[in-house]
């Protein structure tokens, strides 16, 4: 109900929606109905993430809201994120069919491997596996995600190890007085999924629950003309859930406690090769604001992970296989993070904080030859880290100057590698404890001009410490064996970027461009030691240096009220500069990094009908360090259309890989390919 005696303009805003401005005539007395339209990409690009550490450089952020998640056509969150420029997983794989160890994330061409070179946060808590750095994307219930922000570019000055290529910050839904959202779908390849999110407030207290059950029969990874008796569909069955208890701490603060659980069982494409994972997590956090003291945030978290996997050797004709290794990888982590931020007048903002983490894990293996046990192998260790950071941002008229840095110190201890053969003497090795330190500074400058133009420039250093998986765990994919290396050193990056953004035509058109350059010393790569038709042997080693440089271009346009189109282009030149141990690798392309990536999104949104499509082109890349195993270029399109049958119920149909492109996923050297056309139909229910 609105009552006014004079003419005026009423502005209403809500997260995820465009601000509505309505002219209110004089002498208005009665109800006023206002409809909020979903926020455009133009607005979303400029939204600062919930974690205040993420810098507000407009040329390097990409945001995805709940509406776009629904319109993407993708079932898993990693496939939704592929619309972000530079986002990629190891071996082009996805959460529906990939082994967990190949779901490490990379941004901006720094090179993908099993261990992510980007940090993934869920409400400020790291989501990367503490043991291996990869991400279990199916831990995230679709309907419980409010938004995702992707920051391209090194951010170790704020986040330390893991943020070598950038940060992905995922925010869950905000708890309201009472709500329940449910999505259920079913499709071909025996695929079905149900996701839900709900909660209720009781005075100052609140409780929220979220969960997801996903199952797919999957598809056969090997091309039809190369299949044998051992080849089966690569499917998965996942179950995840969480319960969150929250309490308001006065008008300016809140605290929460979240308990989560995740279970997954996968078939990896042959009769013998399977894996399963069990994860529990406990997160405790509090946020509090005070006009005089500033904003405070604290997180305390812990988790345990059990990852089990079988490896096999497949005959050349793929008619038989034999078990070679059965692994069990238990790991645990505990960590904390504290952050403080305060504005000084209207022209300065300072922030500081510290965080620490303790990770323990090992790989217990049973090796086989001709179905007989040959040895018991166990290797693992412990990694403790502590970091302190600070940042100062000063505004002078239309200039913004930011400088800061972070100091990290970590220690690898209790490292061991034991082998007890059935025949022969045991080998027991203890590794010397090692400590490393990294300083990660950053300087940034932003200039905002009239008419919606802004330019930015940044220079920085970053690092990534090797994971316990890289240090101590061996693995096998196809006929490729990759050995661990306990002597690995931290990767260290030096880089910079410059960017320009333009917002015009009444905020309906947004253009941006970014030039970036980075050099990574001691980059960890899988280096080929020997190659035969039956077996390729590799080891994780520190390369001398690699260089990644390129161009990012983005354009977004909203027109005719309901339509929006967007496109992104990433050109990356990522090459090996120096490797004294093997000069033949110098000048070659970094594995798993395509030179060209093009994305586009189209959406139509109105009260009843909604439609969205996203396309992706990826150019040729190589699967190996010697550039002898190419993966050819491909183009694919995902889409979704939905219709609201009432205010609370919406029906939808979703398609993945509409082009039917069986693009190449990996070459080990056996070729594996991507999924066929995937179709789902389902319903979304929202009760509020």
Regions found by a protein language model. Give the residues of each.
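Short acidic/polar hinge/loop motifs at secondary-structure boundaries
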Residues: 2, 125-152, 173
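Short, acidic, small-residue-rich periplasmic hinge/interaction motif at the N-terminus
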Residues: 13-18, 27-71, 78, 513
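Extracytoplasmic beta-strand/coil segments of soluble accessory domains associated
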Residues: 78-129
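Periplasmic-side early beta-strands and strand-to-turn transitions of outer-membrane beta-barrels
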Residues: 157, 169, 177-179, 183-185, ...
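Conserved C-terminal beta-signal and adjacent last beta-strands/turns
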Residues: 199, 247, 457, 491-496, ...
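Face-selective signature of the C-terminal outer-membrane beta-barrel domain
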Residues: 246-262, 278-423, 430-431, 446, ...
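Membrane-embedded beta-barrel scaffold of Gram-negative outer-membrane proteins
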Residues: 296-311, 362, 448, 454-460, ...
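Gram-negative outer-membrane beta-barrel transporters
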Residues: 395-401, 410, 510-512, 516-520, ...
